[in-house]
């Protein structure tokens, strides 16, 4: 077995070229077993096996620097750079992250997880190399899906000016997470069709040299191409045509479904844990499709992640032209939504919290200054969301809640969410964002009659005295739990408030609390700095009201344990009660 003997790239070079396909199969076998038990990004890694072997066969990592875009396709790279045990031994599966990480290896240069960044990052490495008078190759690896992102195109535009060694390997599998969208993919298709020979070549048009490899899963062909461009003195694109999910029939057949997988049965490809519970994605999709049937102005927008809103391939077909995928281009999604709204449409944009930061300028400039009535729904903005350091959803509250004109709402239940959507999709006075709760969806069957157009009116769910607990969104349930425990342990009848609004204060209610309360507790699912609780604390600043803010510390967490993080931040009912009693 070749893989067991590989401790670094130097061991790859010892294998004869005609034996490298054996190594490729061993890598796929290991990936398959690990994915079936552990889950992870599937299709991107299976398609990149030969290219990764060829890169390490030809180049001298880490002297030659390889930068992976997103880096979700870096599993084979990790296996060849001293981390194979994390893929061969089940007890070591969690030793590595799902993305490149300089803390793991000198062969990783950046911690990344968002798309379209590799060309710009690698261009910076190349520029620094040139300024220092050093040599060595710099290689940016980027997938065709990531080319729809603005930063990728900006990076390509700059790359031509380097006029020194810079290699851009474009892994073209004719897929993003789902199908690609955008005009540039017509050119990629033409390049594939003509074996890279067409004169209409977007890379050449940007001033880059160009090499095409049709057999992108043929390790010998890749080695030949990489040897041709090694030590080149001009920026060059090596465009390789690969098969996403190669080597596992279900993944080759259903590429979108197998972009990422949970644990599954290898023989059948069926998931071991079939989640059939209703969630906010399916609720959103059902709601929008129903709206679309009766209103042609309703438009659902995604930036390369259609299933975040529940729009699987069949649902996208059902929506037809009322569903728009702009590619991995969050900025364009927001600006497009603003344009649709200004011209009388009803745009809905669904996005992961981690990607909201990429939209900040457009939300502020193109939407809120213009007061465009868009609806923007934030998914996974929670401690219960994705837990990789590159995909944390902790920062959307301070980012969005401080933009003028925006109404940022936080439902605690399915019914509240749908009521907010009903209001937001029909009103024309405000841009609206909705932060979905983390964790399992709560549905209490209640009928929500609240008029959300009467801004910043909190709801008192239970009237008490002395202590008021304001639980925002996800943590409204925690507020109720803490109040119940206070009554059981200290006979304190606490007021419980569902604020709904992240962007504004119910000053009348907060003022009224001064009459018979001496402590206000705020709970929010995000970082405290610049967040919801600080606004409450500032309101009471010169009064005698004691304010206790609970949320998350400002820090980067990686692959964390949710319960541990909650306890560290005193976000349990028991700890909150203990804190209250300690100061009473």
Name each region found by the language model.
Residues 1-79, 215:
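N-terminal amphipathic, basic-rich helices that act as targeting or association modules
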Residues 39-48, 67-72, 101-120, 142-146, ...:
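Active-site nucleophile and cofactor-binding loops and adjacent substrate-binding regions
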Residues 41-162, 298, 303, 312-313, ...:
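Cofactor-binding active-site loop characterized by glycine-rich and histidine/acidic residues
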Residues 108-264, 270-277, 282-284, 406-517:
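Glycine-rich ThDP/TPP pyrophosphate-binding loop and its adjacent helix/strand module
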Residues 263, 269-274, 385-387, 398, ...:
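Peripheral docking tails and interdomain loops at the edges
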């Amino acid at each position: 077995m070749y893989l067991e003997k590989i401790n670094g790239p130097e061991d790859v070079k010892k294998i004869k070229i005609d034996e490298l396909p054996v190594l490729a199969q061993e890598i796929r076998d290991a990936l398959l077993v690990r994915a079936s038990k552990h889950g992870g990004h599937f299709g991107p890694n299976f398609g990149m096996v030969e290219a990764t072997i060829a890169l390490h066969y030809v180049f001298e990592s880490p002297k030659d620097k390889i930068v992976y875009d997103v880096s979700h396709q870096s599993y084979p790279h990790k296996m060849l750079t001293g981390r194979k045990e994390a893929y061969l031994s089940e007890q070591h599966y969690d030793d590595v992250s799902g993305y490149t990480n300089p803390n793991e290896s000198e062969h990783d240069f950046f911690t990344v997880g968002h798309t379209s960044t590799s060309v710009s990052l690698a261009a910076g490495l190349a520029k620094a190399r040139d300024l220092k008078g050093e040599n060595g190759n710099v290689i940016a690896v980027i997938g065709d899906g990531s080319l729809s992102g603005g930063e990728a195109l900006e990076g390509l535009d700059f790359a031509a000016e380097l006029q020194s060694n810079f290699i851009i390997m474009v892994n073209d599998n004719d897929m993003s997470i789902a199908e690609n969208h955008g005009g540039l993919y017509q050119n990629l298709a033409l390049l594939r069709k003509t074996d890279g020979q067409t004169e209409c070549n977007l890379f050449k048009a940007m001033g880059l040299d160009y090499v095409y490899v049709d057999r992108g899963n043929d390790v010998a062909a890749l080695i030949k191409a990489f040897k041709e461009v090694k030590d080149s003195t001009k920026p060059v694109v090596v465009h390789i045509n690969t098969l996403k999910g190669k080597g596992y029939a279900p993944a080759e057949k259903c590429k979108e479904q197998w972009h990422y997988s949970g644990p599954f049965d290898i023989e059948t490809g069926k998931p071991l844990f079939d989640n059939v519970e209703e969630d906010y994605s399916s609720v959103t999709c059902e709601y929008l499709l129903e709206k679309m049937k009766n209103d042609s102005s309703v438009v659902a927008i995604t930036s390369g992640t259609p299933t975040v809103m529940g729009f699987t391939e069949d649902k996208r077909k059902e929506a037809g032209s009322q569903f728009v995928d702009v590619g991995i281009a969050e900025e364009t999604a927001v600006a497009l939504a603003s344009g649709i709204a200004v011209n009388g449409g009803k745009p809905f944009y669904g996005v992961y919290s981690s990607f909201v930061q990429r939209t900040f300028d457009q939300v502020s400039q193109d939407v809120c200054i213009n007061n465009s009535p868009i609806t923007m729904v934030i998914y996974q903005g929670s401690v219960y969301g994705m837990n990789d350091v590159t995909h944390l959803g902790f920062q959307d509250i301070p980012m969005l809640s401080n933009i003028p004109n925006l109404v940022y709402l936080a439902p605690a239940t399915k019914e509240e969410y749908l009521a907010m959507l009903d209001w937001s999709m029909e009103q024309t006075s405000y841009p609206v964002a909705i932060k979905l709760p983390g964790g399992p969806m709560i549905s209490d069957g209640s009928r929500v009659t609240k008029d959300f157009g009467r801004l910043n009116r909190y709801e008192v769910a239970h009237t008490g005295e002395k202590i008021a607990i304001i639980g925002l969104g996800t943590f409204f349930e925690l507020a109720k739990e803490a109040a119940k425990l206070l009554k059981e342990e200290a006979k304190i009848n606490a007021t419980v408030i569902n604020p709904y609004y992240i962007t504004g204060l119910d000053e009348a209610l907060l003022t009224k609390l001064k009459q018979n309360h001496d402590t206000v507790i705020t709970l929010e699912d995000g970082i405290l700095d610049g967040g919801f609780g600080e606004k409450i604390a500032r309101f009471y600043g010169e009064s005698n009201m004691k304010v206790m803010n609970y949320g998350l510390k400002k820090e980067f967490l990686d692959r964390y344990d949710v319960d541990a993080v909650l306890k560290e931040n005193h976000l349990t009912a028991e700890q909150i009660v203990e804190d209250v009693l300690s100061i009473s």
